[in-house]
Amino acid sequence: MAPVDVESQVELDLKIEDFDYKNVALIKRFMTPVGRVLSRRATGLSAKKQRKMAKEVRKMKFLALVPYCDRHK
């Protein structure tokens, strides 16, 4: 099993209210550079927090706060 990076260990004490589509900097920590959502194993979040975070990512993409993909080639 791959080790969880140190940054995600710090995020475990977040409340579910902290995940908000307007908090782009926080949500982008749980996304790959390509724009995909990281897995629970990589983020270290609970199932409930992971679902909330994924929902907020979808909102951000719909509102064009983050792109759907990194680049079109």
UniProtKB/Swiss-Prot annotation:
List UniProt keywords, sorted A-Z: Ribonucleoprotein, Ribosomal protein, RNA-binding, rRNA-binding
Pfam family name, one: Ribosomal_S18
Keyword RNA-binding on entry: yes
GO aspect biological process, one term: translation
Q: Report the InterPro entries cross-referenced here.
A: Ribosomal_bS18, Ribosomal_bS18_sf
The source's domain of life comes to Bacteria
- Which Gene Ontology terms cover its molecular function? small ribosomal subunit rRNA binding; structural constituent of ribosome
GO terms for cellular component:
ribonucleoprotein complex; ribosome
Known partners and oligomeric status: Part of the 30S ribosomal subunit. Forms a tight heterodimer with protein bS6.
Tell me the protein family, please.
Belongs to the bacterial ribosomal protein bS18 family.
NCBIfam families documented for this protein = S18
Q: What is its biological role?
A: Binds as a heterodimer with protein bS6 to the central domain of the 16S rRNA, where it helps stabilize the platform of the 30S subunit.
The identity of this protein, by name, is: Small ribosomal subunit protein bS18
Starting at the broadest rank, the lineage of the source organism is: Bacteria, Pseudomonadati, Pseudomonadota, Alphaproteobacteria, Rickettsiales
